[in-house]
Amino acid sequence: MTEYLLSAGICMAIVSILLIGMAISNVSKGQYAKRFFFFATSCLVLTLVVVSSLSSSANASQTDNGVNRSGSEHPTVYSATSTKKLHKEPATLIKAIDGDTVKLMYKGQPMTFRLLLVDTPETKHPKKGVEKYGPEASAFTKKMVENAKKIEVEFDKGQRTDKYGRGLAYIYADGKMVNEALVRQGLAKVAYVYKPNNTHEQLLRKSEAQAKKEKLNIWSEDNADSGQ
């Protein structure tokens, strides 16, 4: 609509210029010609103001919401947190401690890692003792990391260690995320979700939902949702 009005304004400007030309050529013919000249000049000024306003409006409408009519987008500025990509770093296995804890050699130093966003049944808890499916979860993690030719750790966007000094990370064995594999097999639950350390939360919840549907391991028990 703006484009049509702009075109009409340009046509009006052209007509006004022609009228001014006619008035100038007849200005010597009397008072009527002078009034005609004044009228034509006023029309031209008014038309130029309208055309200028419409042109500005057209330019603004083309860039609404950061997208112009050609389809290209203006760069969007994001915070450092929202654009930060996770990356994997190499490590070597020292030993698997239990289902959700491993000890690795990381950057030349031994470090214990707690798997992010998951919780496996206990095997060494001073009060809970050995919980059902705890040994199975420990054996699963041990097999994955011991058989892997390449171990990698992937920190999330938030804090990297817990109050015990353990690294908080996603652990990969030959490219497969151990955290997700445990959840998919029904040997771990999605737990301890704290932003911004939750980049892979939806992946894990999807795997957990599938494990529940298939009633695998901890989800085969009647009290699976009791917080065990």
UniProtKB/Swiss-Prot annotation:
Calcium is among the record's keywords: yes
Entry GO MF terms: endonuclease activity, active with either ribo- or deoxyribonucleic acids and producing 3'-phosphomonoesters; metal ion binding; nucleic acid binding
Residues holding Ca(2+): 100, 119-120
Keyword Transferase annotated: no
PROSITE patterns noted in UniProt: TNASE_1, TNASE_2, TNASE_3
Propeptide: 24-60
Domain of life, source organism: Bacteria
Location(s), subcellular: Secreted
Cofactor binding note from Swiss-Prot or TrEMBL: Binds 1 Ca(2+) ion per subunit.
E.C. number(s) listed in UniProt: 3.1.31.1
Catalysed reactions, semicolon-separated: Endonucleolytic cleavage to nucleoside 3'-phosphates and 3'-phosphooligonucleotide end-products
Cofactors named for this entry: Ca(2+)
Keywords: Calcium, Endonuclease, Hydrolase, Metal-binding, Nuclease, Secreted, Signal, Zymogen
Catalytic site: 114, 122, 166
Gene Ontology CC annotations of this record: extracellular region
Signal peptide: 1-23
PANTHER family reported in the protein's UniProt record: EBNA2 BINDING PROTEIN P100, SERINE_THREONINE-PROTEIN KINASE 31
Role summary: Enzyme that catalyzes the hydrolysis of both DNA and RNA at the 5' position of the phosphodiester bond.
UniProt similarity note: Belongs to the thermonuclease family.
Entry protein name: Thermonuclease
